[in-house]
Amino acid sequence: MNPPSGPRVPPSPTQEPSCMATPAPPSWWDSSQSSISSLGRLPSISPTAPGTWAAAWVPLPTVDVPDHAHYTLGTVILLVGLTGMLGNLTVIYTFCRSRSLRTPANMFIINLAVSDFLMSFTQAPVFFTSSLYKQWLFGETGCEFYAFCGALFGISSMITLTAIALDRYLVITRPLATFGVASKRRAAFVLLGVWLYALAWSLPPFFGWSAYVPEGLLTSCSWDYMSFTPAVRAYTMLLCCFVFFLPLLIIIYCYIFIFRAIRETGRALQTFGACKGNGESLWQRQRLQSECKMAKIMLLVILLFVLSWAPYSAVALVAFAGYAHVLTPYMSSVPAVIAKASAIHNPIIYAITHPKYRVAIAQHLPCLGVLLGVSRRHSRPYPSYRSTHRSTLTSHTSNLSWISIRRRQESLGSESEVGWTHMEAAAVWGAAQQANGRSLYGQGLEDLEAKAPPRPQGHEAETPGKTKGLIPSQDPRM
């Protein structure tokens, strides 16, 4: 099935290829596009209605580029696909097996890994195979399905990242408004909305609004952003706005206020620690630093995803502006490969920077734990991993705000169901002070102790997690 050597030109009505019964080239490949083999420009391909592809199979057109260009792109996409499939499958397995990682907030990360895995699984093998033969091999239906999967899973990943940013924004900057909500149920509804939103933007090309067509080196498919028709241009602009730019603005807005809230809470804890003069504030600051690190990790994930899709969006906008004739096959294919490479960023980032993920890998996949350099003592399961939130919500009984939070949480369910982090609990504490009209900065030790209820006898010097003779992770109350 290899194409003949020498210059490749699209089949003409007067020259019948040996592999076809009736030489009827697709309607989107007309004589006006015959210069593609000499100029290396993209054809204007727009099968916007059923039946525009030939009824009998015909060889799709090729572009006049060196063979090694196809092989290079094919090799890159194969490596990207294998890395994306194995890496994201590892993330899914680890997060599902590790109890400490099965929190409502991490449901979004699992969904992101599922979306990235499906992106790699549906895109890389097809792209690689077509690159070996230097032309699209799977016909109209295969092209449409391939492009639909790329759009669906790419949009799902972008909107999932937006949902992560919004979720962190709400629980950190609006803790009282979200306190007590069934987080797992809420996360499930949000993820359902994410997939419905992605589906709503992926289906229109099947109904005549734009189309799914070959692109670049004509070994992969995407939505038609090259045609300069009102319908195609409208779809391209709306897709870029509501799938790329609007989510990007929401993410930027959320993380600006997230880091501002972290900074303000850190100052509040520092002031409180100066008033109390003990080790509690130091422990709280360490937890705050941990939350800040996790926020930075997610911000890095989002930035890499945006940078991966930015070149592809730029190419689409160039064509939208009417300059499709300046786009070469390379200028379309290379950004497409970069966009698909966004599926490999998350597993690599987690493996390098996410401490609990590294430990969970060492526990459930010891061979990978050795590769990541996780020590043997860190790979042993700890009792404290059964809930990542208990130590914070039970370690501050000397303060009435912490006791109120704990009592209310017990009435609502376990920490694993509520899904609060150290940062969120600290934010509730500060927000509760502000809601009562009191400034956290102006409260001294006397004010805080006056509010605290009497402690049980025999526990004046004890706090949960600091029971005599026990380290925090061994406290039976945790």
From Swiss-Prot:
Bilayer topology:
Multi-pass membrane protein
What are the N6-(retinylidene)lysine sites (modified residues) in this protein? Answer: K340
Where does the chain cross the membrane?
A: 73-93, 108-128, 145-165, 189-209, 239-259, 297-317, 333-353
Enumerate the UniProt keywords alphabetically.
Biological rhythms, Cell membrane, Cell projection, Chromophore, Disulfide bond, G-protein coupled receptor, Membrane, Photoreceptor protein, Receptor, Retinal protein, Sensory transduction, Transducer, Transmembrane, Transmembrane helix
Instruction: Cite the SMART domains for this sequence.
Output: 7TM_GPCR_Srsx
Q: Does the keyword Cell inner membrane apply?
A: no
Q: What ranges are annotated Cytoplasmic (topological domains)?
A: 94-107, 166-188, 260-296, 354-478
Bias (Pro residues) ranges: 1-14
Q: Where, in residue ranges, is this chain on the Extracellular side?
A: 1-72, 129-144, 210-238, 318-332
* Signal peptide boundaries: none
Disulphide bonds annotated for this chain are C143-C221
Q: Which InterPro entries match?
A: GPCR_opsins, GPCR_Rhodpsn, GPCR_Rhodpsn_7TM, Opsin, Retinal_BS
One Gene Ontology term, aspect cellular component:
photoreceptor disc membrane
Example GO molecular function term?
Answer: 11-cis retinal binding
Keyword Membrane in record: yes
Basic and acidic residues bias: where? 448-465
Q: Residue ranges of region Disordered?
A: 1-32, 440-478
Subcellular location, record wording: Cell membrane; Cell projection, Axon; Cell projection, Dendrite; Perikaryon
> What is known about the tissue distribution of this protein?
Expressed in the retina.
Q: Name one Pfam family in it.
A: 7tm_1
Tell me, what is an example of a GO biological process annotation in this record?
regulation of circadian rhythm
> Its biological function?
Photoreceptor that binds cis-retinaldehydes. Contributes to pupillar reflex, photoentrainment and other non-image forming responses to light. May be involved in the optokinetic visual tracking response. May be involved in the regulation of retinal hyaloid vessel growth and regression.
Family in the record: Belongs to the G-protein coupled receptor 1 family. Opsin subfamily.
User: Which protein are we looking at?
Assistant: Melanopsin
Species for this entry = Homo sapiens (Human)
Query: What taxonomic classification does the UniProt entry list for its organism?
Result: Eukaryota, Metazoa, Chordata, Craniata, Vertebrata
